[in-house]
Amino acid sequence: MIGLSSWTGRVALAQGGTVIPALTESGLLPPGRHAASMREIREIFVEQAPHADHRRRIFRAFELYSDMIRDILERGTFWVDGGFCSHKAAPPEDLDLAVLIDSSLPLTDKDHERLIPLFTLQGVQAGQPQVWANRVQPMGGLIDSFPVVAGIPEQEEYWDATWSKVKGPDGELVPGAVKGYLEVSW
């Protein structure tokens, strides 16, 4: 069950779990990386958010995506971002993910083959049937996902900076504006 504590301004699970901070007046997470559970994300960014039916479909794709990644990676972390992690007026197009992969995991060639289609691919050309696409996203475009080697500071800093940027309604970056994002680990 979800409980709202107005005196702290934070949303928390009544039966334990992590705490997702209250959103700012503009419907964004406050700056920083915030630990969250899948259950909390569903409650705050689907059930309590505008466009709940639309978001529910994206979240179902995220749940299946998470299961597929966890079938391959015994441990890891998602950094969850994008319009999905907000209460903006416009519905989110997808859910953005950086998937932090522990380089010490004993991944086989088959594991790598299974991972490739789970990430956003750009400049894709296929021989049969002959097709070309600027961008191919997993889960029918509902997930926009990128692999990150965990523990490589340059990669983690890049994605932290990218996920902290704020875009306006026109899709352009808002200079100087900073927001937060979520972290789900298993």
Describe the role of every protein-language-model region.
Residues I2-D81, C85-E93, I101-W186:
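Catalytic core of pol beta-like nucleotidyltransferases
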Residues L97:
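Structural signature of FAD isoalloxazine-binding scaffolds in flavoprotein oxidoreductases
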